[in-house]
Amino acid sequence: SDPSYSLEVADQIADINGVEGEDGPVITTRLKDYRGYGYIALSAKNVNVGGDPSSQASKDLRKAIMTVIAAYRDEGIDSYYGDTATVINYPISNTSWAAPSVTDDGYQIAYSTDVDGNEIYTSDMKSEDKYAAALQAALGYFEAAGYTVANGQITAAPAGAKMEYQINIGASGNGDHPSFQTLTNAAAALKTIGFTLTVNDMANASDLFASYQSGAAEGWVAAWQSTNDPDMYQLYHSQGATNYY
């Protein structure tokens, strides 16, 4: 079987066993490394400036949104999984031999540079400082994308772009998903600078799948699992059979 695990499940196991920890008189738990990963995506077709998904302005728009989302990943994953999951910066599980390592030349934290290519974060930043730095970097990306920015606020969108976008997530309609807190916190942060990110919690998983498989979704949350010998080109090349995983 492939059971779902979270801090809530761990608490339930402890309650059933009557003791703290993974093992007890009723349930014995063994956690194993897993090649699966979850991700948050934006559709280039639906989130762009002026109908040109590949323009620099369109890329800057998507980077603005994702820079803020990425800043809240650690908090969201920690609250859901504790130390049983880690944040990844490339679309492959850290349990795979093919995953980039932090010691590799050129390794970067996802969405950690500003519009000028400078590092957003420093090693001594506290969480609140990190969130503030991400918002400041996002403003730079929004402005580069053609948004009107004044006094730390976004006041108008360029032609062919919007002040609000939506991300669909299958959190059972009640927020039960490891990425839900990440998104809601990012949405709250973006709201403070005048931009609306709507988090659409879809109770029916089939509706979520249909929203991105049909190409209708602006953004979505899903998951994938790499094979023993992963072919990332096949999976992510834009001219392949599908690149939404």
Where are the regions that the model predicts?
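Solvent-exposed loop/turn segments at secondary-structure junctions
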Residues: 3-6, 36-37, 46-48, 71-75, ...
